[in-house]
Curated annotation (Swiss-Prot):
One of its GO terms (molecular function) is catalytic activity, acting on a protein. Mg(2+) 2 binds at residue 413. Its cofactor is Mg(2+). This is Lysine--tRNA ligase. The lineage of its organism: Bacteria, Bacillati, Bacillota, Bacilli, Bacillales. The gene is lysS. It comes from Staphylococcus aureus (strain MRSA252).
Length: 495
């Protein structure tokens, strides 16, 4: 911290003491506002300067917020007060507010939170303003804000001190308001479709429902190892068994993996399950829901991302994973008959694989390394190999593949879904195959979950399921390049 900053803080501490000496509480209590800055503008900006003079008796307002600018000398001054909706100018005159309140005004610093009661008027330049009749200090700020002309430029500081970012960067505030709206519209859409929102445990006895490394914790009283959930899936499907036919949960998921522009150790997902549906129905639902959210929150289903127009309005492409790989590389995995042939093709095309990988894993590596980043417009990739889809139903026409899809937009995965595997015998066999992979060194392979198998043995109806990473969806709809831009408090390495 610079010497100048220390000096500014010292001055503010002295002002704080002066307030106490005068019997003024520098951390005040409730203040009744008549509205936000946007409300005042909507109601009063339509009038001319002269009309506002005529309406002065009816234009009494009360506004509160943070002082962001301040200017003027002598017996009057202007400032801008910022609230959630934006900024509005205030005008403070000694002969209007009195000596004591004008002294408060003179000693106020940028960053202080104030309340102003007054009447509406327009300046000679036509700016709608509040002429103060009463000026109240609500909270004394003891630290100066970042430079008003440059805002908070250090990207890491923006993430570590999000509160400063929200104060100084209007775009950040808009992003997080839109994040809330996106989640709300998701709920509205599903509730209107008859889905029931539920809550399931975040600490699991078995880490299941996804291929990921879990965070491990310990329950002292029970002397039990527990895992922070890596997916919501298996508990929701137990509810389908129990007769709750359309369920969803929006919640935090935890994966003990790397941090990047696309990944945070804890993130928000929605998972939903619908009895008597299949992955085609879930494709339709996903496309309709995302389009609805974009229209409701942004006013358009054509959105800008990284300089590219993403068309969520037109019908989304649907492409089998084998066809996608064939289009990109010329390799037709329908014709590949063995793991050895797949490995030879990987070597020929420069695909990095592990020695333990089989046909399905290698096909998926072809896709991830040669196709994924090219899928800019919304594209459903379906038909994933059985080896990498332990919870999805096999395709009845070709059991090498499953009735599963992933949604790709701007070159990254946004959703994962499938017709759920409801055959308990097949499911147990898949879990056993996953255990074999774990024994060969795949630490992301699925554990055996006997309790889930038991639930399936009571009978789960044909079901379609979906998982969407909400953070990535918010990135898309707010044109944010990093997941940290859409998390209020992203994980940061310790200083």
């Amino acid at each position: 911290m610079s010497e100048e900053m220390n000096d500014q803080m010292l001055v503010r501490r002295q002002k704080l003491q002066e307030l106490y000496d005068l019997g003024i509480d520098p951390f005040g209590s409730k203040f009744d506002r008549s509205g936000l800055s946007s409300d005042l503008k909507e109601e009063w900006d339509q009038y001319s300067k002269e009309e506002l003079v005529e309406k002065e008796a009816d234009s009494h307002v009360a506004i509160a917020g943070r002082l962001m600018t301040k200017r003027g000398k002598g017996k009057a001054g202007f400032a801008h007060v910022q609230d959630l909706a934006g900024q509005i100018q205030i005008y403070v005159r000694k002969d209007q507010v009195g000596d004591d309140e004008f002294d408060l005004w003179k000693n106020a610093d940028l960053g202080d939170i104030v309340g102003v009661e007054g009447v509406m008027f327009k300046t000679n330049t036509g700016e709608l303003s509040v002429k103060a009749k009463k000026f109240t200090l609500l909270t004394k700020s003891l630290r100066p804000l970042p430079d008003k002309f440059h805002g908070l430029q250090d990207i890491e500081q923006r993430y570590r001190q999000r509160y400063l970012d929200l104060i100084t960067n209007e775009d950040s505030t808009r992003t997080f308001i839109n994040r809330s709206k996106i989640i709300q519209e998701m709920r509205n859409y599903l509730n209107n479709k008859g889905f029931l929102e539920v809550e399931t445990p975040m600490m699991h006895q078995i880490a299941g429902g996804a291929a990921a490394r879990p965070f491990v914790t310990h329950h002292n009283a029970l002397d039990a190892t527990l895992y922070m959930r890596i997916a919501i899936e298996l508990h929701l499907k137990r509810l389908i068994v129990g007769g709750l036919e359309k369920v969803y949960e929006i919640g935090r998921v935890f994966r003990n993996e790397g941090v990047s522009t696309r990944h945070n150790p804890e993130f928000t997902m929605i998972e939903l399950y619908e009895a008597y549906a299949d992955y085609h129905d879930i494709m339709d639902l996903t496309e309709s829901m995302v389009r609805h959210i974009a229209n409701e929150v942004l006013g358009s289903a054509k959105v800008q991302y990284n300089g590219e127009t993403i068309d969520l309005e037109s019908a989304w492409t649907r492409l089998h994973i084998v066809d996608a790989v064939k289009e990109a590389t010329g390799v037709d995995f329908y014709e590949v008959k063995s793991d050895e042939e797949a490995k030879a093709l990987a070597k020929e095309h420069g695909i990095e694989i592990k020695d333990t990988m089989k046909y399905g894993h290698i096909l998926n590596e072809f896709f991830e390394q040669k196709v994924e980043e090219t899928l800019i417009q919304p594209t459903f990739i379906y038909g994933h190999p059985t080896e990498i889809s332990p919870l999805a139903k096999k395709n009845p026409e070709d059991p090498r593949f499953t009735d599963r899809f992933e949604l790709f937009i701007v070159g990254r995965e946004h959703a994962n879904a499938f017709t759920e595997l409801n055959d308990p015998i097949d499911q147990k066999g898949r879990f056993e195959a996953q255990l074999a992979e774990k024994a060969q060194g795949n630490d992301e392979a699925h554990e055996m979950d006997e309790d889930y198998i038991e639930a399936l043995e009571y009978g789960m109806p044909p079901t379609g399921g979906l998982g969407i990473g909400i953070d990535r969806l918010v990135m898309l709809l707010t044109d944010s390049p990093s997941i940290r831009d859409v998390l209020l408090f992203p994980y940061m390495r310790q200083k």
